């Protein structure tokens, strides 16, 4: 093995060492010391692993924790559950969703809430943190007088790890394999905005907006985009973008959350974001595959904003699917609130979780494990029991070699009763056509369902012989208006469901 020494001779307690000449995708063991004393290492648990070649499709393991910096037994339980679930295997990317050290983000609180809490993980895992309001101080946004965060971390402001240079440690991007990560600063706004309380307007840094547009536009070498920051754009727990009560802190929080929703989510969605991670609300909430929701946060979503109303679970046979070309190219992403890695709210004090976009939610301690393998992303919410309480999968271009736009064929299954099944046009405007070949005589039912599974219209319910069938349907007469609907094809031994969109 080759030994290399890197020395910082300056008399300081804050050392930053720049190491050059490293190989991609390589594990390097290291030791830290002075000219007279060895402080730590070298040993098998103290190493760093360099990023793989950008665009490579090797499996990637990501760990997301949010609002974790309490230094308490809850935080330790979340940590241990993750380590046990993953058999203490290497984590490639560790993202922090803000509020990393309570209550004021001081150096001492980072020591107890972070460094003392992860003594075996930090020496071998690169952390990619986001700023939360408590990292500025407990009086933020009214007073922001603490920035120990910027002294503790050195973050890529010049595009050193991939992406576009931001010039600001509060927001940055990096590449790891075929994933592009974007970290935003949801707390980056001027305190002057708060003087208009309660009619506050929040305008985030124009520099961050411009940078995000440029960064995502230049991201052409990765297959996935994961964005993360602190103040979630959607939640219905301890904080909500739809809060309508009288608590001044929650009013301000709601305005900040809506600002992230309205100013940044459209940019992220327009550039094909796949997964958005955030914290702030002390619970776990996970959305459907969605696009373009800027509604009220109530329990009933505009149908057109939910692109897939299923569970997203591979175990249910219902993974979310995205296409990279065609009429729905790169549309849709999943939003996860993971503000529960050390504390949670409760149904008693904070009320029910009933957000229009969320399919699974709970006041439950835990963290999120994400695994990316080529064109498949799997996510698992690991609670303190050490099990996956929730999971979902996104697959890109599933079984597709040339993506048609019209007609829209349904993938065939071996020995299927239906062959050459297609629906066109899709999206539906006024009329649409259904075509299929029936392999065996069957009693056939074709129904239109809404996303809850309720039947809107029955198109066919009859015995049919072997042969080819074509039906042209007046969409308006069947109840299809703007939104997402399901077409259900059913026989005694087979059930197929195809999503369609009315315009």
Sequence positions of predicted segments:
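Residue-level detector of high-confidence beta-strand sites
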Residues: 6, 278, 286, 391, ...
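Acidic, histidine-bearing metal-coordination/catalytic regions of metal-dependent phosphoesterases
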Residues: 1-76, 80-89, 225, 363, ...
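Solvent-exposed loop/turn segments at secondary-structure junctions
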Residues: 68-71, 100-104, 133-138, 181, ...
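A short C-terminal boundary segment appended to hydrolase-like catalytic domains
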Residues: 331-333, 339-408, 417, 422
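C-terminal outer-membrane/trafficking sorting elements
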Residues: 413-424, 428-503
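Conserved, compact domain cores that house catalytic/ligand-binding motifs in diverse enzymes
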Residues: 58-130, 135
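Extended active-site neighborhood of metal-dependent phosphoesterases/phosphodiesterases
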Residues: 27-43, 47-49, 107-221, 225, ...
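Active-site neighborhood of phospho(di)ester-bond hydrolases with catalytic His/Asp-centered motifs
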Residues: 64-66, 93-99, 126-133, 226-230, ...
